[in-house]
């Protein structure tokens, strides 16, 4: 149905609120009750944001919520959303590893599931009208539950009249909500999950200004502050799935956590990017994705040994489109599923071991092995082998270059 004023009398109906416990979503609870008469069911979806969740039940209750769900979906997030992006080497505009983009559909799916369980008629989110998140949440909800209303308070300016955090805090106080909220002065706008942390705002809004990395970084150190010695590691893969780190079997969630630690202390995966948002504007952000950067580099390192040239060329095209579709919030679209099906078909023999060394922001290849390797040492050698004779190249060059030869002869005749 989309984001609009609910039709008819909504008093007593249930609405699902994507809830973090912060100021915005706290203020939304009494606002929904006052303006629409909704019973508010809060849902916090844990995708590894590392926030303190223990006080959320009390905060939601004091804010007037009927109920709170805290949904721990980190393993589901890894297996159903992160893994397809790893296998697709997903990267938007050559730098952004889609940390927020892949998390929003996972959250939207859980919001819809609880809406159906609770018999809710609507879902509400606190995303602003300028960013990509509103699109990702709403496209996911529309795809999974088109019958649900979607409320986006920041776009409902006739009713959501707050102009500042101070306005929101005054409103909460007026409604008897006496809770502490962290100050946003001198702080970045951040999004964190198991895969990454994004930073926006403050000096990053000026593209001429260097990021204040000392103040900004949370997962990582700068390459200049990384250790002076290399950190070696190996990753074992089975059909495009990373299954072991340094010989130790572990889940994808565990591996990402460990690689975030190893990569972070070596200054891996810090990018400063100006990206093109879906809504048309450019935005600047700094992203920390240490574990994800290592996994994607290792995966590409293994694929280049195993996949034939034409498959790699086609996969590159699919990867770019896959990344765009995910960035635009179309996770549940048939196109994303079709693109993923192609990617998955290429992973059948992507098994083996990738070795690398981490050093001051760099990932240095240290060897790759696979039982499905297409690398043939006797073919690649400069010496003549049984399968290849240097003389064979002459006929190939004649045929391969025939169009150029014909064109040159034609131009000479003219």
Annotate each PLM feature.
Residues 2-18, 23-414:
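Nucleotide-activated chemistry modules centered on ATP-dependent adenylation/adenylyltransferase
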């Amino acid at each position: 149905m989309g984001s609009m004023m609910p039709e008819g009398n909504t008093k007593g109906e249930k609405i699902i609120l994507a809830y973090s416990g912060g100021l915005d979503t706290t203020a939304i609870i009494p606002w929904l009750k006052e303006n629409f008469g909704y019973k508010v069911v809060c849902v916090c979806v844990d995708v590894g944001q590392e926030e303190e969740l223990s006080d959320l039940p009390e905060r939601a209750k004091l804010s007037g919520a009927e109920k709170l769900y805290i949904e721990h979906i980190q393993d589901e997030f890894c297996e159903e959303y992160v893994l397809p992006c790893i296998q697709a080497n997903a990267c938007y505009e050559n730098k952004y590893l889609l940390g927020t983009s892949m998390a929003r559909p996972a959250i939207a799916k859980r919001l819809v599931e609880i809406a159906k369980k609770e018999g809710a008629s609507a879902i509400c989110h606190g995303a602003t009208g300028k960013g990509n998140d509103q699109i990702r949440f709403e496209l996911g909800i529309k795809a999974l539950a088109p019958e649900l209303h979607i409320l986006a308070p920041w776009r409902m300016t006739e009713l959501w009249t707050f102009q500042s955090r101070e306005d929101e805090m005054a409103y909460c106080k007026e409604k008897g909500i006496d809770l502490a909220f962290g100050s946003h002065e001198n702080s970045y706008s951040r999004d964190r999950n198991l895969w990454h942390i994004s930073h926006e705002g403050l000096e990053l809004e000026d593209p001429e200004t260097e990021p204040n990395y000392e103040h900004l970084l949370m997962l990582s150190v700068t390459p200049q502050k990384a250790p002076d010695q290399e950190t070696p590691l190996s990753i074992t893969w089975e059909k495009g799935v990373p299954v072991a780190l340094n010989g130790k079997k572990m889940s994808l969630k565990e591996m990402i956590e460990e690689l975030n630690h190893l990569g972070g202390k070596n200054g891996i995966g810090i990018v400063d990017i100006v990206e093109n948002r879906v809504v048309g504007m450019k935005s600047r952000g700094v992203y920390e994705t240490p574990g994800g950067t290592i996994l994607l580099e290792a995966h590409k390192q293994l694929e280049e040994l195993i996949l034939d040239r034409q498959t790699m060329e086609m996969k590159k095209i699919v990867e770019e489109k896959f990344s765009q579709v995910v960035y635009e919030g179309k996770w549940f679209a048939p196109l994303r599923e079709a693109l993923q099906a192609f990617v998955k078909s290429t992973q059948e023999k992507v098994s083996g071991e990738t070795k690398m060394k981490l050093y001051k922001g760099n990932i240095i290849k240290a060897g790759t092995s696979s039982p499905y390797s297409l690398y043939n040492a006797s073919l690649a050698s400069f010496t003549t082998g049984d399968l290849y004779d240097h003389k064979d190249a002459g006929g190939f060059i004649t045929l391969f270059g025939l169009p150029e030869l014909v064109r040159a002869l034609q131009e000479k005749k003219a």
